[in-house]
Amino acid sequence: YLGWIFQGPLWSKGGAYSDEWDLKFTDDKTIKAVEWLKDITDEKNGYSYVGNDMAMEFGTGRAAATVLSTGDLAGLTDTAKFELGTAFLPNPTGEGACPTGGAGLAIPAGISKNRQLAAIKLIDFITNEENTCYWSQNVGYMPVRSTAVDNEDQKKFMKDNPNFETAIKQLPETRPQDNARVFLPGADQEIGGAFEKIVTNRDDVTKVLTDLQKTLQSIYDNQVKTVINK
């Protein structure tokens, strides 16, 4: 999910994937930020790299630091052979440089009432306070409901395991992801694939981002615009 990982650094350098539905892949600041990504991942002169499994790379000591989902935290805590620490993502502009993440649970309007009732019961079970605390403590994701954060067992767990509290403390500094990544069908794969061409194949940044903008603009025009304008 390189498209998600790079959203924060991109913001911190003044770039963006989009402003609402206005795509920004070919804006000067976006191009400059992606040029920076290409530079720091240069095999000879860079100081970073992109791997297939950065949790494993970091957990085995091949990488000194990494940016990951909190969903990797519990596994790394159990397997890392060194003292593990977590920290806020850099926010040099003060405008937020950590994107929100995760997924959601929804009930389709077009299914039967019985299935809708079954779905809401399942969602209630998955997200109730007790199960939210269990899930958070055993995976690493931050609790998905505020009552779980205030749960006494959860409070004790986070006091004993402060790495699990970092994301909660950082939440006021987060920003919703740009529309271009989260609302355009297939956009995450397109963005990640474009970055892989740049980082791995060392392709020209401007050309790759121009092609990406054309692809995602077509997706918006043909699949999204007609729906949101109804």
Describe each model-derived feature in a short phrase:
Residues 1-22, 29, 63:
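Extracytoplasmic/periplasmic solute-binding protein
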Residues 20-48:
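Glycine-centered hinge/linker elements that transmit conformational signals in sensory
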Residues 35, 42-45, 77-142, 176, ...:
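Extracytoplasmic/periplasmic substrate-recognition and gating elements
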Residues 47-60:
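Short helix-initiation/N-cap motifs at beta->coil->alpha
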Residues 51, 68-73, 103, 168:
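Beta->alpha turn/N-cap motifs
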Residues 64-69, 85-87:
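Paired acidic/hydrophobic, glycine-rich loop segments that form the ligand-binding mouth/hinge
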Residues 87, 137-197, 222-230:
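Long, aromatic- and glycine/proline-rich binding clefts that accommodate carbohydrate-like moieties
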Residues 197-210:
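Short, charged, surface-exposed loops that flank catalytic or proteolytic processing sites
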